């Protein structure tokens, strides 16, 4: 069941915003870049990689096409991250929560809608975001891949693992199997991602990391996504696991970034890529200077 959520904005303003959103192309735009020998792949990533988590959710509307495009144009991250859910008819869409309530003008479960009904969903940008943002429809995964695939490395999280086969088909059809990390918190799902021939990312919480033995995953995980709140020893164990890339989430401050790099991580997922770009700094020597330990 889908319900309407009352907006705190004046009704006339909401109507104008909705009308403007309907008259804009939203997910149109130029055709894909000429790739030459092929799309941009993970082989192009720098030694230390910055990921715009949910597009950079403290700076742009999360999981929106306009937010992803803004993060792409700003160039403060080398990877753009977004979340995926599956609609009732199997269509993968870009969305984080199980329900529509927090970030749209509607309520109810995402999986309760089909692709036609999805066209009526409108995001509700947070008031405290910098800049001015219009209300727009959340994109489908296909739309993001067609707009940004091959232009920049992407990272998508499978919130609904049942959508893996369809997502895998989209990536193969577009030649993007080396250009998109496919993320999950479940090692069993990560194994399926690997068997599908995709770049496999496995994220872990601080609590999970206390009991993890990440060296067991090194033969089939391409990216281990670790929690910045984890203990130093747990982060070091991840770094020494043999997994090719170890990146830390969700980093917001320069001090958190510096701690992650000092402990050996070679990338960070951040909600504020612009902020971190302004404070590149140096990796501190003793970790205790950053963590207080």
What are these regions (language model features)?
Residues 2-11, 20-293:
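Phosphate-group recognition and catalysis centered on beta-loop-alpha active-site segments
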């Amino acid at each position: 069941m889908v319900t309407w959520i009352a907006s705190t904005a004046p009704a006339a303003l909401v109507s104008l915003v909705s009308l403007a959103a309907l008259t804009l192309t939203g997910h149109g735009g130029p055709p894909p870049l000429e790739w030459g020998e092929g799309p941009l792949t993970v082989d192009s990533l720098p030694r230390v990689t910055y990921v715009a988590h949910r597009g950079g959710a403290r700076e742009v509307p999360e999981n929106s096409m306009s937010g992803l495009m803004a993060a792409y144009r700003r160039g403060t991250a080398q990877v753009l991250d977004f979340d995926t859910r599956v609609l009732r008819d199997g269509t993968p869409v870009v969305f984080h929560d199980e329900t529509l309530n927090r970030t749209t003008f509607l309520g109810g479960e995402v999986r309760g809608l089909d692709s036609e009904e999805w066209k009526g969903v409108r995001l509700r940008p947070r008031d405290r975001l910098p800049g001015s943002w219009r209300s727009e429809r959340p994109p489908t995964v296909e739309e993001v891949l067609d707009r940004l695939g091959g232009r920049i490395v992407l990272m998508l999280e499978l919130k609904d693992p049942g959508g893996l086969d369809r997502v895998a088909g989209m990536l193969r059809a577009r030649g993007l199997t080396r250009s998109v990390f496919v993320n999950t918190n479940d090692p069993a799902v990560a194994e399926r991602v690997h068997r599908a021939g995709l770049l496999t990312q496995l994220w872990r919480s601080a609590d999970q990391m206390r009991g993890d033995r990440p060296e067991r995953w090194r033969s089939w995980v391409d990216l281990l996504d670790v929690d910045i709140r984890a203990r130093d020893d747990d982060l070091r164990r991840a770094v020494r696991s043999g997994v090719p890339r170890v990146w830390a989430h969700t980093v917001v401050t320069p001090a958190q970034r510096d701690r992650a790099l000092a402990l050996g991580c070679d990338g960070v997922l951040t909600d504020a890529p612009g902020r971190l770009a302004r404070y590149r700094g140096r990796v501190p020597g003793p970790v205790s200077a950053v963590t207080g330990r």
